[in-house]
Each structure stands twice: as C-alpha cells, then as structure tokens.
C-alpha cells in the first residue's frame, strides 16, 4: 500500500510542476519583448548575434552556396535589409546599412 501512495504522490508532483512551468512560460512570453527599437536609426535590434550574409544549412534564407542568412523568428543583429513574404530574407551586415537602405532615393518616374 505504501508504494502505491508514493507513486500517486510522485505523479501529482509531476503534474503540478508541468502545469506551473507552462503557466510561468506563458506569463514570461507575454511580458518579455526581445525586440527593441533602436533610437538612432529606427531599426529593430534584438541584441543577439547572427550569421549575416553567410549561407549555411539549418538557417532560414540560407543554404549551401546561396547566401542569404535571413531569419524567420529571431530577428537580425543590425536589422533587416531585405524583407520577404515570410519575414526577413537578408540581414544587414553593419548597423548603418539598414538606414542606408531607408534613405536611398528611388525615383518613380
């Protein structure tokens, strides 16, 4: 009888920790915003590094020999320089490149 009680208690504790971790993760996801707006040039910066303009397997927008290096979920270190339908297709390689793309004049004649 004692082993059944310990098994039941262990299962109850496992369910408790599972539910509480889901609740904490949900609250953390609602309150945290990793993307912040850089005050200098208005580019979204998330503070994380990235492999800019490097093709590689396993990264969105990259691939063997193709370059790209865009990211679907994480964002880019210095902002996005080429946006596509599903998000960023190419990350900027330096901080001023995103601003250069914004200020380039393209005549519509």
Curated annotation (Swiss-Prot):
<dbReference type="GO" id="GO:0071555">
    <property type="term" value="P:cell wall organization"/>
</dbReference>
<keyword id="KW-0732">Signal</keyword>
<dbReference type="GO" id="GO:0006952">
    <property type="term" value="P:defense response"/>
</dbReference>
<dbReference type="InterPro" id="IPR010800">
    <property type="entry name" value="GRP"/>
</dbReference>
<keyword id="KW-0964">Secreted</keyword>
<keyword id="KW-0568">Pathogenesis-related protein</keyword>
<protein>
    <recommendedName>
        <fullName>Glycine-rich protein</fullName>
    </recommendedName>
</protein>
<keyword id="KW-0961">Cell wall biogenesis/degradation</keyword>
<dbReference type="GO" id="GO:0005576">
    <property type="term" value="C:extracellular region"/>
</dbReference>
<feature type="signal peptide">
    <location>
        <begin position="1"/>
        <end position="26"/>
    </location>
</feature>
<comment type="similarity">
    <text>Belongs to the GRP family.</text>
</comment>
<keyword id="KW-0611">Plant defense</keyword>
<dbReference type="Pfam" id="PF07172">
    <property type="entry name" value="GRP"/>
</dbReference>
<keyword id="KW-0134">Cell wall</keyword>
């Amino acid at each position: 009888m004692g082993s059944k009680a310990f098994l039941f208690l262990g299962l109850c504790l496992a369910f408790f920790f599972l539910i509480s971790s889901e609740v904490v993760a949900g609250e953390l996801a609602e309150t945290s915003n990793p993307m912040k707006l850089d005050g200098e040039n208005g580019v979204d910066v998330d503070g994380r590094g990235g492999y800019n303009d490097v093709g590689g397997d396993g990264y969105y927008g990259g691939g063997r020999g193709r370059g790209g290096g865009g990211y679907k979920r994480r964002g880019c270190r210095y902002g996005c320089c080429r946006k596509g339908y599903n998000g960023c297709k190419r990350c900027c390689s330096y901080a001023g490149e995103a601003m250069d793309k914004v200020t380039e004049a393209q005549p519509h004649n």
